């Protein structure tokens, strides 16, 4: 997902530099959304791994 965020960011910056500000802004906005979704998923999965690891180590 971070790969797509980076691709949309680069495309948005290129479009903005070429004068297509509206479309470029939309791509940059989409890149921001994808970036924050990826960060949120990372945090959720890190917490799940932390709590699952504690339960497994407690039961052994």
Curated annotation (Swiss-Prot):
The chain crosses the membrane at residues 4-24, 33-53. It is a multi-pass membrane protein. One of its GO terms (cellular component) is plasma membrane. Keywords: Cell membrane, Membrane, Transmembrane, Transmembrane helix. The keyword Aminoacyl-tRNA synthetase does not apply. Its main location: membrane. It is found in: Cell membrane. InterPro entries: DUF1328. Belongs to the UPF0391 family. This is UPF0391 membrane protein Swit_2334. It comes from Rhizorhabdus wittichii (strain DSM 6014 / CCUG 31198 / JCM 15750 / NBRC 105917 / EY 4224 / RW1). The lineage of its organism: Bacteria, Pseudomonadati, Pseudomonadota, Alphaproteobacteria, Sphingomonadales.
């Amino acid at each position: 997902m971070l790969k797509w965020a980076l691709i949309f960011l680069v495309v948005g910056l290129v479009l903005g530099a070429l004068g297509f500000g509206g479309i470029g802004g939309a791509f940059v906005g989409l890149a921001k959304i994808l970036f924050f979704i990826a960060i949120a998923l990372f945090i959720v999965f890190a917490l799940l791994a932390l709590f699952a690891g504690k339960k497994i180590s407690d039961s052994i």
